[in-house]
């Protein structure tokens, strides 16, 4: 998967890198799931839409919101950020680049007003909108680096370290992970949704991936109090949703590369909802002026949602999370105005094995890892009896002849984890104790060169069913109607 950067010559020079967990002979990957038909809203539903930025609520769930209003179903829309750091908006709307923090704050206020007008086009009153005000383009960094004793993050353009908007849900809230999590848990517990429409974990925009991750943790924390089904919607993905422009007769379908590992559903959007959705998008004037051709392809006769199929691993079990045997994940050039770049080059797969007291991850490269390049593995654990802010958040950086382990940028002893390169094979082993003996594990792999980030996988979730001697807290089931895939008992590839 790729981050939002223009693809450079340096990145192109590394197009030989491919990540394939050493699981070619492991258990079958999480099975591809065809779109499992349509779902319908019904009596008793309560709809919560979690949008990373103003306009995402329309792109991902505009039809849902319109139908819910027509049926008298309660709705609430929550915006993670004000979208105040989109420099293209300044160039096209203000006809000049942003140079001062106050200009970014002004843009955030404008985008909030646009969201109110867009909601009115869908029939949603302003009283049902909540704006959190966290930093645009910054929330994935908060997820990775800003918990507990770590200082708050700083807004990219606003330069703020706390929510700077007086109209936000909690003005002055520090830009830290536990603050975002607390806000989401408060709002979810207050509204008690039955369905949550949220951004997708495979989305290439960092705020979109981050909002899904925070939402997952919030729902786990609220297990037993709130039972809601997640409906993640995809927005930023290479060469998807296809041709630009208004295509009201062509249905959305999942990217072929995301069929495996996700359970997809769709719902129909009627002509009246299509018209309302388009009108709502035009209300986001700062975005419409420069990217109407990117927004319109989401106005279709259906809306599409696909959640992670979460595998369960028992000791000795292994699973492939991704598989692309014919190399369809080859990189592509940047494909939109925001600099949405290519996939992780030639990504074939990602696999995980659970040993009795450690988790083992291996990666295969087409060629040995070039000098100056690195592969980084993130592993964040979750368990219900420890605040997530206090859980280790490990990042293992693997270079051709060395590795280092950090927890929120703090260097940790090498005994915290083990990693090595052997020709085209990369491998890492992390003791469960280093992860505080989690019940669930977030995993991600990234590649980088000296001058430019190259790419990243989605964040994946694995449930760990450890042996009694190492398992600290058993969790059976989830409030989010998760689908799980069993992993076979096989030997580690190394």
Which residues are covered by each model-predicted region?
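Bacterial N-terminal signal peptides that target proteins for export
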Residues: 1-14
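C-terminal accessory domains and tails appended to enzymatic cores
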Residues: 31-33, 140-152, 158-173, 183-186, ...
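Bacterial N-terminal signal peptides
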Residues: 11-25
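Proline-aspartate-enriched helix->loop->beta-strand connector
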Residues: 184-203, 208
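Acidic/polar low-complexity flexible segments
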Residues: 313-321, 377-404, 423, 432-494
């Amino acid at each position: 998967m790729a981050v939002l950067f223009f693809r450079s010559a340096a990145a192109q020079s590394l197009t030989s890198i491919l990540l394939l967990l050493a699981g070619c002979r492991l258990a079958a990957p999480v099975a591809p799931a065809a779109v499992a038909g349509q779902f319908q809203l019904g009596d008793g539903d309560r709809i919560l839409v979690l949008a990373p930025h103003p306009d995402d609520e329309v792109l991902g769930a505009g039809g849902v919101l319109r139908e819910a209003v027509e049926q008298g179903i309660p709705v609430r829309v929550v915006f993670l950020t004000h979208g105040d750091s989109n420099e293209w908006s300044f160039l096209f709307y203000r006809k000049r680049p942003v140079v001062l923090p106050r200009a970014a704050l002004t843009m955030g206020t404008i985008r909030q007003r646009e969201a109110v007008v867009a909601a009115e086009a869908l029939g949603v009153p302003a009283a049902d909108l909540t704006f959190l005000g966290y930093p645009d383009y910054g929330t994935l960094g908060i997820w990775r680096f800003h918990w507990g004793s770590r200082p708050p993050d700083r807004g990219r353009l606003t330069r703020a370290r706390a929510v700077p908007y007086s109209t936000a849900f909690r003005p002055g809230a520090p830009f830290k992970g536990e603050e975002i999590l607390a806000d989401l848990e408060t709002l979810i517990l207050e509204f008690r949704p039955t369905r949550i429409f949220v951004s997708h974990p495979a989305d290439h925009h960092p705020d979109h991936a981050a909002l899904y991750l925070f939402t997952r943790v919030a729902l786990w924390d609220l297990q037993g109090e709130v039972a809601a089904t997640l409906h993640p919607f995809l927005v930023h993905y290479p060469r998807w949703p296809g041709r630009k422009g208004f295509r009201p007769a062509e249905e959305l379908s999942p990217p072929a590369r995301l069929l495996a590992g996700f359970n997809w559903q769709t719902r129909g959007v009627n002509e009246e909802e299509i018209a309302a959705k388009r009108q709502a998008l035009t209300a986001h004037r700062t975005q419409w002026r420069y990217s109407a051709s990117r927004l319109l392809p989401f106005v279709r006769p259906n809306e599409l949602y696909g959640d992670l199929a979460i595998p369960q691993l028992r000791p000795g079990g292994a699973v492939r999370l991704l598989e692309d045997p014919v190399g369809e994940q080859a990189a592509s050039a940047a494909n939109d105005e925001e600099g949405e770049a290519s996939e992780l080059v030639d990504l074939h797969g990602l696999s995980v094995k659970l040993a009795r007291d450690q988790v083992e991850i291996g990666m295969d490269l087409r060629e040995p890892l070039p000098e100056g390049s690195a592969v980084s593995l993130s592993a964040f654990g979750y368990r219900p009896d420890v605040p997530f802010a206090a859980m280790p958040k490990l990042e293992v950086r693997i270079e051709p002849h060395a590795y280092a382990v950090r927890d929120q940028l703090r260097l940790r002893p090498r005994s915290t984890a083990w990693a090595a390169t052997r020709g085209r094979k990369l491998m890492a082993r992390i003791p469960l104790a280093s992860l505080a003996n989690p019940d669930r594990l977030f995993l991600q792999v990234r590649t980088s060169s000296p001058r430019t980030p190259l790419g990243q996988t989605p964040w994946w979730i694995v449930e760990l069913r450890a042996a009694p001697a190492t398992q600290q807290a058993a969790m059976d089931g989830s409030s989010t109607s998760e689908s799980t895939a069993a992993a076979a008992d096989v030997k580690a590839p190394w």
